[in-house]
Amino acid sequence: MEGLNVNFEELEHMDLEEAKKIVSHFNNEDDYEELGATIDGIEYGLDIVDESNWDDQGKYQYKDVTGILCESLEDGSVTKYDIAVTQYITRSGSYFTSYNYEYDPLQVDQLVQKVIPQQIIPERTIVVFAE
């Protein structure tokens, strides 16, 4: 994975087990933009940060969508947590008939920062077109 386009400093910490309990209330067959649940008067949802294109493998096509777990309060404030929720979608059928969608259980992961060390490419000789 290349990394998510997320400002890690803006995220609040949440325990992974607590996040899994919250996400267990989500209906994994909802459209990814509608994933969420209201628990004890608190609305939880996702801020989508990564969406793949459909990967066509013949009979089946695959797609995954990842969002950051968010808590929305009635006053309009939103708290984003260091939790990523990924929905894996499989579809069969075609544009001309209709698609049948299947959804894997939602994957819940803790987000962390990872430092990538600077890499220096060693000198080498390559062959190119003459100018």
Kindly give the residue locations of the regions a language model identified:
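Acidic, low-complexity, intrinsically disordered interaction modules
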Residues: 36-108
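Acidic, proline/glycine-rich low-complexity IDRs
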Residues: 91-131
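N-terminal domain-onset segments
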Residues: 1-60
